[in-house]
Amino acid sequence: YYAVGCALLTGRPLQPVPAAYRAMAELEMKHVAAARDDFSEFFGYTEVKYPYSLYRPRGHYTRNKSLERYFRAMMWFQTAPACLDNDRQFRAVVMQAAVLSDHPEDMKRYDDLMEPIAFLVGEPDNVAVRQVADLLRRGRYVLKALMTDDATLEKFRREVKVIAEAQNRIRPDERFELSCRDKINLMPQR
């Protein structure tokens, strides 16, 4: 996830990615570059296409390569979803939130980026990793238990679900829902 975002931002090759994920990360890079909706094993979009067309730079972001890279990276971090109901994806979010929570200087950088956006554009539609980090801290959860114990993970998932139910405003009618209902993003779009 982060290797793809970093490569999109810098224009450099992917940083080392574990062998099990290398091909998947390379495929994500190709999909983003093509900017055509397609299936994504990485995001679990195997029955419906993921909207890679969102990654096509537009407006002033087309002025130069640097702005195009910035646009694609920001879209990646804003739209690349983790599904609350998918254990693998949810555990990855929990790990991200724990790392963020354990590093106050990184949490401050994250807040310094997100707070002006929230002020100017409003609160996010999906749950943010920051909110998951706050719940981890308040609930005094042990990361190892969340990674290995399904009952603990399910209890925590219910707490995140409360946020999702109150906050997520953009949802398709359940009859037409093609992807997961509740998504978590590093930097959710508004």
PLM segments and residue spans:
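Long, non-catalytic protein-protein interaction scaffolds
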Residues: 1-190
